[in-house]
From Swiss-Prot:
<comment type="pathway">
    <text>Aminoacyl-tRNA biosynthesis; selenocysteinyl-tRNA(Sec) biosynthesis; L-seryl-tRNA(Sec) from L-serine and tRNA(Sec): step 1/1.</text>
</comment>
<dbReference type="InterPro" id="IPR033729">
    <property type="entry name" value="SerRS_core"/>
</dbReference>
<dbReference type="InterPro" id="IPR002317">
    <property type="entry name" value="Ser-tRNA-ligase_type_1"/>
</dbReference>
<dbReference type="Pfam" id="PF02403">
    <property type="entry name" value="Seryl_tRNA_N"/>
</dbReference>
<keyword id="KW-0547">Nucleotide-binding</keyword>
<feature type="binding site">
    <location>
        <position position="389"/>
    </location>
    <ligand>
        <name>L-serine</name>
    </ligand>
</feature>
<dbReference type="GO" id="GO:0006434">
    <property type="term" value="P:seryl-tRNA aminoacylation"/>
</dbReference>
<comment type="subunit">
    <text>Homodimer. The tRNA molecule binds across the dimer.</text>
</comment>
<dbReference type="InterPro" id="IPR006195">
    <property type="entry name" value="aa-tRNA-synth_II"/>
</dbReference>
<keyword id="KW-0648">Protein biosynthesis</keyword>
<comment type="function">
    <text>Catalyzes the attachment of serine to tRNA(Ser). Is also able to aminoacylate tRNA(Sec) with serine, to form the misacylated tRNA L-seryl-tRNA(Sec), which will be further converted into selenocysteinyl-tRNA(Sec).</text>
</comment>
<keyword id="KW-0067">ATP-binding</keyword>
<dbReference type="InterPro" id="IPR015866">
    <property type="entry name" value="Ser-tRNA-synth_1_N"/>
</dbReference>
<dbReference type="GO" id="GO:0016260">
    <property type="term" value="P:selenocysteine biosynthetic process"/>
</dbReference>
<feature type="binding site">
    <location>
        <begin position="235"/>
        <end position="237"/>
    </location>
    <ligand>
        <name>L-serine</name>
    </ligand>
</feature>
<dbReference type="InterPro" id="IPR002314">
    <property type="entry name" value="aa-tRNA-synt_IIb"/>
</dbReference>
<keyword id="KW-0030">Aminoacyl-tRNA synthetase</keyword>
Amino acid sequence: MLDPKFLRNELEVTAERLATRGFILDVERLGKLEEKRKSLQVSTEELQASRNAISKSIGQAKAKGEDVAPIMAKVGTLGAELDAKKVELAALLDELNAIAMSVPNLPDESAPIGADESENVEIRRWGTPKEFNFEVKDHVELGETLGGLDFKNAVKLTGSRFIIMKGQIARMHRALAQFMLDLHTTEHGYTEAYVPLLVNEDSLLGTGQLPKFGEDLFHTKPATEEGQGLSLIPTAEVPLTNIARDSIIDEDDLPVMMTAHTPCFRSEAGSYGRDTRGLIRQHQFDKVELVQLVKPEDSMQALEELTGHAETVLQKLGLPYRTVVLCTGDMGFGAAKTFDIEVWLPAQDTFREISSCSNMQDFQSRRMQARFKAKSAKKPSLLHTLNGSGLAVGRTLVAVLENYQNEDGSITVPEVLRGYMGGLEKIG
């Protein structure tokens, strides 16, 4: 959520910056609503002051023995007018808040301006794609031949975009998640967290999934003691970041760095017909998430470091990748700046996204009222929040299967995973 004062005072500037990400801010409508708000605010305050002044005169009139009935009638009339104005003002503020909640974050000035993913900027590459002397198979053919990926029975149990993993491939999937968690907690300084997979509406509003992306969520019917429905998490970013909601963190406790391995659930409402084959785009998938809460002046450096933490996973697995900075037109709703990490998939002969690392600045923290208190400050300030995949486990499995395949259809186990797989060197 943008700073309401900035939005009001810098409406044209805000509209120009939002236009670079393809969002058209209705400046005329907002301007009219803001003028109406100011007018209502003034008239409400004037009515309140008049009512208070006349109410005080009742006691004085009684002391003089005067008839207070006309004064009481006037107070009643003013009270009714005031109540009506308050209702009108509240409705207008709700309308303005609804607009504010639907406006995406302002792109950081360092984000390249562009319309779509074709204008993203590659900033580095690591590793060299292997040249195979045989025809490469994709992960679906490899996994099904080895008996480790069962799409047919997953469809029978649930539907499309689900998977059953078995045997050593299921074990490798688990090993990848354990390896990622161990790396981030022992070498990168993150604290592991176990979090709920179901969250309430306030949490989804806090991190920006609601109100705009409700159709991409799986919702439950009202079933809690509080009587509200819950939603399955689309990413562990939601519960991890919301831990700081309605909190004030001491400056000495920053940065807060958390990681969690969870299943994630997405309806993929806007992805009909895309990546229908294999594990690339599933309704349920595992991910190791990285979240940081930092002081504003530290957030851009923290983004570089968080992205590096995700890249280290691929480096240790020996998987070639490239890192791109997203242009303004391709960034997510709440991001001020984003780096995407794309891993090489031989069967597709291209790089595919495996991690997205974003600096949200104070966009989420303003929604959540997540703040910190500096020693020298009289009042708390909004935190900056960052998140990234460290990594998507299923897509990492895809990359390992395809990059480590052998001509006979077997898979060489990357050295860093062998300790998690009982010393196993090859699958198949």
